[in-house]
């Protein structure tokens, strides 16, 4: 018996079926990523979701290590330039040097990139912000303050970055929402299915 002839439409349907099948394990649901204990503790104390705190830290201080994006505690942002240090001591020296040459409102430090100028009342010594536990406690506190009961946490996340809101807050929300989807193990895209729907007769 002769094999059935292949037509462009049958090839297209076959490719779409393969694409959909390949996308099901990862395109529909991702494995949930449980935030490390320090994030869970800080979030619990502040009364906020630990996934929200972890997603913010991934956005603020995330670096690639061993193929994974992880928050880095000894991170600074000085006048828009990210700086990473190998140790807390090195980061503290870098912070002190930056403070001598840069307005404090243009310096962010630690896991949650706490601003030295706008949040000066939240710490005693600037290098305290390089203590991961202290930094997370402050970040969680700020998120809690920016959240209105009953609203989506993404709105509070936007105000964490820019309390006045606007487009900078919206851009930040979009970036953090991708990290949040990864942490929560939720679907991030339906592109393969949509693409096949467009081509189906």
Predicted feature locations:
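Catalytic glycan-binding domains that act on GlcNAc-containing polysaccharides
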Residues: 32-201
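Short, intrinsically disordered, low-complexity terminal/loop segments
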Residues: 1-4, 199-201
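Bacterial N-terminal signal peptides
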Residues: 14-25
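Sec/Tat signal peptide C-region and signal peptidase I cleavage site
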Residues: 27-31
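Bacterial N-terminal signal peptides that target proteins for export
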Residues: 3-16
């Amino acid at each position: 018996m002769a094999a059935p002839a292949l037509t462009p439409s049958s090839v297209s349907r076959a490719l779409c079926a393969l694409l959909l099948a390949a996308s099901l394990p990862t395109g529909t649901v991702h494995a949930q990523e449980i935030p490390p204990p320090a994030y869970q503790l800080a979030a619990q104390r502040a009364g906020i979701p630990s996934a929200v705190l972890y997603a913010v830290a991934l956005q603020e201080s995330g670096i690639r290590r061993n193929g994974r994006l992880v928050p880095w505690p000894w991170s600074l942002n000085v006048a828009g330039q990210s700086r990473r240090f190998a140790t807390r001591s090195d980061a503290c020296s870098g912070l002190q040097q930056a403070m001598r040459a840069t307005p404090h409102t243009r310096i962010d430090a630690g896991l949650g990139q706490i601003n030295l100028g706008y949040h000066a009342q939240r710490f005693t010594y600037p290098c305290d912000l390089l203590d991961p536990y202290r930094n997370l406690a402050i970040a969680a506190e700020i998120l809690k303050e920016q959240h209105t009961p009953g609203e989506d946490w993404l709105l509070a996340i936007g105000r964490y970055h820019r309390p006045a809101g606007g487009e900078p807050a919206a851009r930040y929300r979009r970036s953090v929402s991708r990290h949040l989807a990864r942490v929560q193990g939720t679907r991030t895209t339906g592109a393969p299915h949509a693409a096949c729907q467009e081509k189906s007769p």
